[in-house]
Structure formats: C-alpha cells, structure tokens
Design a protein with these regions (language model features):
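A structural signal for well-ordered alpha-helical scaffolds and beta->alpha junctions
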Residues: 3, 111, 178-182
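Conserved blade-ending motifs and adjacent loop-strand segments that build the rim/top face
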Residues: 219, 347-370
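Acidic, Gly/Ser/Thr-rich repeat motifs that build Ca2+-stabilized beta-propeller blades
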Residues: 16-169, 224-227, 232-244, 306-344, ...
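Sec-dependent N-terminal signal peptides
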Residues: 2-15
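Beta-propeller domain segments
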Residues: 75, 84-86, 164-350, 386-389
C-alpha cells in the first residue's frame, strides 16, 4: 500500500528520448475494428468490429464465415460521435474447456448489455441461442458507453468498464453516484451457472444503497483498461472532456478508488475551481487535449496538439522487444502517437515507428497475444503487430 500512495505523488515528464520499434500488418480489410483477442490455446486472432461482428483472421484477412454476427441486435453507430455497437469481448479463463466468452454491446433499445455466449459444436461458430444476459441497463445518450472486458489474472474475476452515460460534463453526475453502473469499473464472479455473483471482497458488497458490483468509480469514459500480467495492477485510459486526457492506475487488489470525474478532469478541478482535489485519486499521467481536434483533422499528426481521446494499452511483457519490456504502451485515437510509460522511473517516451508515422491512423485499441506480444488496432481497418526496431 505504501508504494501505491507514493506512486501518485510523482510527476510524469514527457519529452525523453524516443524508443524505436517496428510493426507489420497482420490483418486488413476490416470494418471499424475496435478490439483484437487471441484464442487462449492456438493464438488465432479474433477481431471485434463495432458493426456487430467478430471475425477470425486467416492469412491476414477475415475468414468468410463469421465467428459471431449480432448486427441485427445492436444499435448501429451512424452519426459522428455515436459510440454504440459491439464494444467488447473477452474469452473465459477456461474457454478451451467450456467454450464461454463474454461480450458487451449497446442494443437497439439503447441498453448496455453484458452477456455470456458459447461456441457451437463447430468451434469456429457461436451458438447464438446460448446467450445469457448478465447485466442490462439503459443508456441516456449514444456515447461514453465504455464496454471493455478483462479477466483479472490473479483473482479470475470479470472486470467491466462503463462510461458516465454521455453528453457533456456528465449532466446527471452519474460518475460520482454509487447506485448506478455509470463511470465505473465493475468486478464480478462468473464462475457460476446462474450468471454471476458479487465477490465479498468488493468494496460495496452487501450495501443496499450502493451497487455491490462496483470496484472503482469516478471515470468519464474508460476506453480500454488492462492488467499488468506480472502483478495484477490495472491501467486505465480515461478519455477527457475538453482539456486533459489521463491514465489512471489501480494497485492489484485495491478497490473503492474514486478518480474524481466530474469534479476533476485529470489533476484539475472541473466544475468548481475551488474543489477539494485531495479526496480523489489523481491520474499517473495526464496530457493536454483539444476537444475540437477531431472536427478538423482526424488522425493527422500536428506538433502542437497532443491529442483528443486517449487509448489505453498494455504493460509489455513479451520477449521480442527488449526496450519496451515492463513499460505501459498507450496512444491517442486522434493523433495516432504511440507512448511508453516506464512507471518505475516515471518517464514517458514517445515511440518512433516507421510504418505508422507517415499516414493517417485512428488507434482504437491494443491487443495482447498468448505470448504477451502487442498489437495495434487501427479503426480504419488494419491490425499491426509491434516488433523490435532495427
């Protein structure tokens, strides 16, 4: 716990020497890809598309037969700023034995849905009749839906991220309320036939006025979070409102953290300049953003703009890129810049990458295969694998 408290008192400084890596195209021809997952035994690549499909990649292109197609069930994103659709997927820790996996989507009635599904007798196709809905609640707007899913590497519980419900400035103050799921990371135990139970170690377990599923709260729109596979620490990319993007941190096993939104944006008071900021957990990284950037030049690099929408990534624990080992890799959806945080030395490096550096990219996510190697998901339809730089 002492390490946890010290960590948030340190200042992260950008502008260090760049780290050089390379990348190669491993999948293309995709339609609005948001996430990449890997079969826990074969390492075959599965890509989640916002349009409602999960596709399996063969020889760099989607296979002809879809693993899953729920495009008839989801609210399709049709307008700029509409973030609905199929948003998340994760394999059950025992997927090889039970065939279970979990998805998060926004349905046609504008409800966020978390459900469990199972593969059919053909392991390349899902049994659509197997869907068991675990969580379903109405979204007030069409953005800030969150939808990311991860299993904790140490406790085996399912963690689920949801945004504040959308619009501007969290108009209902959802993220500071504990009687709803908005602006939270949830933690549930899915090791039951009935759907899920709430772990007794959750901070609000058995509290009738608070949602027992909540693990952490005070988030605006957690766009991808992940666990350091070595120690179970959580890193969260939380998208800012107008001025600040942030990376938040939860030490393994520490629940009940309040990251401050909509009282705080990054390290700064948001609604009231005289807010009492020491009541909240500050981000380990913040960087300035321009909320209007995307309206003028999506995905084009500008030296005077840091970005407009953080994309959380992973702590690299692979064996092929020595200069990234132990560093947290993240990006920005609007600029496509790659960064690496050395959170032991409190230094952020910009990553120099020749394949991605000269073109338009909208980095919607990162992926980690069974060998702990990292992948970059470009919303424009391409998946890249990160490699050692020459």
């Amino acid at each position: 716990m002492f390490k946890y408290l010290i960590f948030f008192l340190l200042t992260i400084v950008f502008g260090q020497d760049n780290l050089v890596v390379e990348s190669s195209i491993v999948a293309k021809g995709l339609n609005k890809p948001l996430l990449v997952r890997f079969h826990p035994e074969t390492n075959v690549m599965y890509v989640v598309q916002q349009t409602g499909e999960i596709v399996i990649i063969n020889d760099k292109v989607p296979s002809e037969n879809l693993f899953l197609d729920i495009s008839d069930k989801i609210a399709l994103s049709i307008m700029p700023g509409d973030e609905r659709g199929l948003l998340g997927m994760v394999f059950d820790p025992n997927y090889v034995q039970n065939g279970y996996f979990y998805i998060c989507y926004v349905d046609k009635d504008n409800h966020s849905v978390v459900s469990r599904m199972q593969v059919s007798e053909n392991p390349l196709i899902v049994d659509k009749n197997s869907e068991l809905i675990l969580i379903r609640f109405e979204q007030p707007f069409n953005n800030h839906n969150g939808g990311h899913l991860e299993f904790g590497p140490k406790d085996g519980y399912l963690y689920i991220g949801f945004g504040d419900g959308g619009s501007r400035s969290d108009p209902f103050g959802n993220a500071q309320k504990l009687d709803n799921f908005f602006g939270t990371i949830l933690r549930i135990d899915t090791n039951t036939d009935s759907g899920y139970t709430i772990p007794e170690s959750n901070p609000f377990y058995n509290n009738k006025n608070k949602k027992g599923e909540i693990w952490s709260y005070g988030l605006r729109n957690p766009w991808r979070f992940s666990f350091d596979s070595m120690n179970g620490d959580i890193f969260i990319g939380d998208v800012g409102q107008d001025s600040w993007e942030e990376i938040d941190y939860i030490e393994s096993g520490v629940g009940g953290t309040n990251f401050g939104w909509n009282i705080m944006e990054g390290n700064h008071c948001y609604l009231d300049s005289t807010c009492v900021s020491n009541q909240y957990i500050n981000p380990i990284i913040e960087y300035p953003s321009d909320a209007n950037y995307m309206k003028s030049l999506v995905g084009r690099k500008q030296t005077n703009v840091s970005g407009c929408s953080v994309t959380g990534g992973y702590v690299y624990r692979g064996s092929n890129i020595n200069n990234l080992y132990g560093k947290y890799i993240f990006s920005d959806f609007c600029t496509g810049v790659l960064w690496a945080l050395d959170y032991q030395k409190d230094i952020v490096y910009e990553i120099t990458e020749s394949v991605l550096s000269d073109d338009r990219h909208m980095i919607s996510s990162f992926g980690e295969d069974i060998y702990k190697e990292l992948y970059i998901v470009d919303f424009l339809g391409v998946i890249y694998k990160m490699k050692k730089g020459e």
